[in-house]
């Protein structure tokens, strides 16, 4: 045999990553799409599976015939973009205050390299981890498969020891056995469990068995979670029947620029199972004790200071998701034809026609009518609409999409808030009660059946989809920049609206359902549908006053009854018999609140959904947000959303102890508002002219109503 020559390139790994990153940015050969909040990230399934144990577990658990789209909802889009950039470039840039959040995300995703990068940058993290002796080498072994355990008996130090992400819970197959079948090893796990030994060196390879051609279903093996198995591959995939508890959902009623959901549950909507990593309360590290997140939904009533003990809000079972709370709002989307083909339910695989009412009816089949729990993840809800909206996330069928950027949403309420997020001069929001004839002159070429692009002079048909298609011609999608002025934008929707400004065309958007129009006649017909529902539905026969809310109407009639003894039956004054069967939207809360506030001495507020009564407005508003899913307070550190001001203040104390108020001039932190006010006095003469003390709050208020009670 002649001389053997070894040819090796040190640049090959880096060049390979660069090419993969180019393919990702240009969406070339991408076989999976990760949906985080309102953004979609195309990627390569093999790259994600090799870089993060969470994705490896997720892809193997869903099977080969699963959909290409997966939802990751325990991370913000901005942070996931940074993590994805690290996967493809091995580099990550973030603020110092965000390191703790990135570190926790790396733990939940199972990204060993990112954890090591955090340890190398902050040596204190390495010293706080109670490292265990490794039982196997990490980089020389391949063909690994793991399941993160949710058992609290494993301290985080064991999971971070050395170069192994999951410590003793993650075991490796020797290189000679890397080509073995995963299904084969899974069947041998149970038989090898009784023969596993703790050895100080890598174990011998497991015995070979006959090959199995038929794939075996993934099963949960709770007994394997209590002890590490050496010489085998731990394959206890977590399902809804395992001991892995579903994560809390952190949903909000208003959305930031980059996200509309920041939940803490790792529920894969493509399968309806909980493929979740170890819970955050089971993965606390003393080194990051000050940055640990506090699940404020688990606080007792005394901690909230104003909560009614009868509400049981502090129970760990309660998970409130975004809900439109109105059956009528969904009716507007039936004619939109957003989904032109039947889609399978990701829970039971039943093929569902693209009809909103049928899909919602099918969602009720996955709700236990006796207990009010979700049959998929056993989450409990108090009201029916929240249950249905929650189950829609398991079904995995997006019912609504943005006309401009085609971002998918589960509810119309989420879509409407997404469109309200950006303010653009060429996007004119039209309300149902606005006079349309006065806006006729704002339409580009109102008297002409065609439109003309001001950027290139091309003649376009007066159709929004044609205009949208032409906008893409003036975009640099790869660089996410405008081809006319080279301005870059963080998200596609704002970029497309910006590019539309160069075209000289105005688009009118419906304030109710976010539909867009460039033809005045179509807009007029569409708004007529909303105007018929926006008209006053309740009329008083005594004084000719009109009301949109049944609660406000009934209270008004009760005043007549007190004064003149007239009949005030519940149906008195109804002009439309169909209203007896009509379910009122969520505005019934607001109508009742306003009616009761207007009367001095009245200290009771009654919820029309559950019948509970409250003595103060703050209590009633907090309770109302439970039914609507609104969380108007957002933490500036970890971007989580909360219902009340008291809860966000308690949460801020978990970030380094006293991140309550931050000076906008020098960045100084204060624990109380009085201390911050005194500190601001030092900067007299250098403060901006529009400075207000509210700018120092370490939380964002997304609701004007919630801003009525500022800090004192």
UniProtKB/Swiss-Prot annotation:
Signal peptide: none annotated. There is a cross-link at residues 183, 439 (Glycyl lysine isopeptide (Lys-Gly) (interchain with G-Cter in SUMO2)). InterPro entries: BTB/POZ_dom, SKP1/BTB/POZ_sf, ZBTB39_BTB_POZ, Znf_C2H2_sf, Znf_C2H2_type. Disulfide bonds: none annotated. Residues 30-96 form the BTB domain. Residues 129-162, 176-224, 236-260 are annotated as: Disordered. Residues 134-147 have a biased composition (Polar residues). Coiled coil: none annotated. GO terms for molecular function: DNA-binding transcription repressor activity, RNA polymerase II-specific; RNA polymerase II cis-regulatory region sequence-specific DNA binding; zinc ion binding. Gene3D superfamilies: Classic Zinc Finger, Potassium Channel Kv1.1, Chain A. SUPFAM superfamilies: beta-beta-alpha zinc fingers, POZ domain. One of its GO terms (biological process) is regulation of immune system process. It comes from the Eukaryota. The keyword Metal-binding applies. Belongs to the krueppel C2H2-type zinc-finger protein family. May be involved in transcriptional regulation. This is Zinc finger and BTB domain-containing protein 39. It comes from Homo sapiens. The gene is ZBTB39.
